[in-house]
């Protein structure tokens, strides 16, 4: 059995997907990171196998029937605007500088339902 955690990024913005994937691969090297440009792409895969779902605010709103039961595994990619403060769903401010973004990801890890044995802070370029 494969114990390697899998993480899904569901976001239509290619640069956001690639940037987040790169950061996650640095801080969670033991994880498999998959990107999807739409909710339908995720549904065509095996949607319940993921340890975490990083999703755009729009996808969360449009498909909250899927993500609400998985809110402990769901992280919404948005700004820190009060309108994005969702009940019980972590929000990652994607407009922060890289160093703060990485620190926010590490803080989210502390409250994650899945444990990663060793996360490291990458060198900020």
Regions found by a protein language model. Name each.
Residues 117-123:
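Conserved small/polar residues in nucleotide/adenosyl-binding loops
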Residues 1-113:
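N-terminal regulatory/sensing modules of transcriptional regulators
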């Amino acid at each position: 059995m494969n114990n390697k955690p899998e993480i899904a990024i569901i976001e239509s913005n290619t640069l956001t997907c690639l940037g987040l994937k790169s950061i996650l691969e640095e801080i969670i090297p033991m994880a498999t990171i998959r990107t999807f440009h739409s909710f339908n792409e995720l549904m065509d895969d095996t949607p319940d196998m993921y340890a975490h779902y990083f999703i755009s605010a729009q996808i969360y709103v449009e498909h909250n029937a899927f993500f609400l039961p998985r809110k402990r595994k769901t992280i919404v990619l948005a700004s820190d605007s009060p309108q994005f403060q969702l009940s019980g769903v972590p929000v990652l401010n994607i407009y922060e500088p890289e160093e703060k973004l990485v620190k926010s990801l590490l803080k989210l890890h502390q409250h994650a339902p899945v444990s990663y044995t060793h996360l490291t802070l990458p060198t900020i370029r």
